[in-house]
Amino acid sequence: MTTSAQSVLELLPAVDIVDGQAVRLLQGEAGSETSYGTPLEAALNWQNDGAEWVHMVDLDAAFGRGNNAALISDVVSQLNVKVELSGGLRDDESLERALELGVARVNLGTAALENPEWTRKAIDRFGDKIAVGLDVRGTTLAGRGWTKEGGDLWEVLARLEDAGCARYVVTDVTKDGTLQGPNVELLRQMVEKTGKPVVASGGISSLEDLRVLRELVPLGVEGAIVGKALYAGAFTLPEALDVAGRR
């Protein structure tokens, strides 16, 4: 890999799904949805604008009220980009179903906190197709739709490192959907404690935020999930890709 390639911040525009619609939540709270049309329209929009990844979240599955698996399967089949899927992956059945949809990677959230032995086996079985989403409030992890505490971040990280986790998606839940800027200090602490790639999520509001995150790429920040700022028109995806070094 060349030096220039190493300085590229991978962008993952988000498509959050509730009841078959693409939505954005404020700080992950059910009932705070703003609708943005169909998931396929949203994902194709990002693909056409130059994305190589889409971060898709089945919020119904995350909140334990059914799932959008059939819809997601249809969307993935019509895309040429890689899809990272999150939401409601808590057992072998849901994990296998998600991977069978054709996604490139899945994010384990609550299950990684509540069932560490199952998580270890999933990582052993599927390797770098598994990322673990760490949703953080201070240094306390939030579980199950961000409504319950899930333990100390550094204790859980040590356990996941021991299990061989390949990648972490780190969200400061106090920032998510707020356009208040990412938690750079949290990301710095994360990359200091793991040699694995870290994907940043939550709070990205401006091209300047992306410039700051790109400076962390040599330290181990691999990418950034961008949601509300794109939907709200703070910047376009092509503009963001320019700043991230991809175009």
From Swiss-Prot:
The active site is at 16 (proton acceptor), 135 (proton donor). Its EC number is 5.3.1.16. The gene is hisA. It catalyses: 1-(5-phospho-beta-D-ribosyl)-5-[(5-phospho-beta-D-ribosylamino)methylideneamino]imidazole-4-carboxamide = 5-[(5-phospho-1-deoxy-D-ribulos-1-ylimino)methylamino]-1-(5-phospho-beta-D-ribosyl)imidazole-4-carboxamide. This is 1-(5-phosphoribosyl)-5-[(5-phosphoribosylamino)methylideneamino] imidazole-4-carboxamide isomerase. One of its GO terms (molecular function) is 1-(5-phosphoribosyl)-5-[(5-phosphoribosylamino)methylideneamino]imidazole-4-carboxamide isomerase activity. Belongs to the HisA/HisF family. It comes from the Bacteria. GO terms for biological process: L-histidine biosynthetic process; L-tryptophan biosynthetic process. InterPro entries: Aldolase_TIM (IPR013785), His_biosynth (IPR006062), HisA/PriA_Actinobacteria (IPR010188), Isoase_HisA-like (IPR044524), Isoase_HisA-like_bact (IPR023016), RibuloseP-bd_barrel (IPR011060). GO terms for cellular component: cytoplasm. HAMAP family: HisA. It is found in: Cytoplasm. It is an enzyme of class 5 (isomerase). Pathway: Amino-acid biosynthesis; L-histidine biosynthesis; L-histidine from 5-phospho-alpha-D-ribose 1-diphosphate: step 4/9. Keywords: Amino-acid biosynthesis, Cytoplasm, Histidine biosynthesis, Isomerase.
